């Protein structure tokens, strides 16, 4: 899979915020297997870019393409299939089912497009230190725990790219390192690309390319 951005200009962003960007108003190609870091100061359109990449929002000029096909010409059914099999994501606001248990949040995702066995949920939860939370409602967990839940959930499906929006904002250094290692391990197994957007450089991410939004 290849993601291409051709002269993307958000409808809502001031001109001065797009003039010096490595992304806005540029041609950017992100190939499967590449690890791309996007450093985006507050107000530069980081989360909007993430939503553009995932096809949630289309309030921009220019073209965003999956495998040379404009996302604006992709049908809802095609987009749903792409999200199920090729694109995984950790949203900044996580979007967990707060009244479901942690395990249910993970297992629902796994069963929609099975890639791992259920046993891997326990293994990943152990690696990220949330095994004792699996039977607890997700909404009662701390935000840092919820971030780890969202990361593990995103790793349950097949993907060619995983998109991450400030995935470690509420994690300490030790937990950030563990989470990044797990993400990279799973991406490498699939030969998948990683797109990580954050407010500043992430020292735990071995990016092949850094873009400044």
Regions found by a protein language model. Give the residues of each.
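Helix-to-loop junction immediately C-terminal to a conserved catalytic motif
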Residues: 54
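Q-loop/switch helix immediately C-terminal to the Walker
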Residues: 93, 99-112
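Catalytic Walker B motif of ABC-type/P-loop ATPase nucleotide-binding domains
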Residues: 162-166
């Amino acid at each position: 899979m290849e993601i291409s951005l051709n002269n993307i200009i958000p409808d809502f962003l001031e001109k001065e915020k797009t003039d010096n960007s490595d992304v806005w108003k540029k041609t950017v190609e992100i190939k499967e297997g590449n690890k791309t870091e996007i450093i985006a100061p507050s107000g530069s359109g980081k989360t909007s870019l993430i939503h553009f990449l995932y096809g949630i929002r289309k309030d921009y000029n220019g073209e965003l393409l999956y495998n040379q096909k404009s996302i604006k010409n992709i049908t809802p059914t095609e987009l749903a299939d792409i999200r199920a099999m090729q694109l995984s994501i950790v949203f900044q606001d996580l979007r967990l089912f707060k009244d479901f248990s942690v395990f249910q949040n993970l297992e629902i995702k796994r069963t929609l497009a099975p890639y791992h066995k259920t046993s891997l949920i326990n293994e990943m939860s152990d690696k990220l230190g949330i095994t004792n939370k699996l039977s607890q409602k997700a909404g009662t967990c701390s935000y840092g725990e919820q971030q780890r839940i969202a990361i593990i959930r995103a790793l349950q499906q097949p993907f060619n790219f995983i998109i991450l929006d400030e995935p470690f904002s509420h994690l300490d250094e030790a937990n950030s390192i563990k989470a990044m290692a797990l993400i990279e391990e799973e991406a490498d197994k699939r030969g998948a690309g990683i797109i990580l957007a954050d407010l500043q450089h992430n020292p735990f991410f071995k990016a092949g390319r850094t873009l400044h939004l």
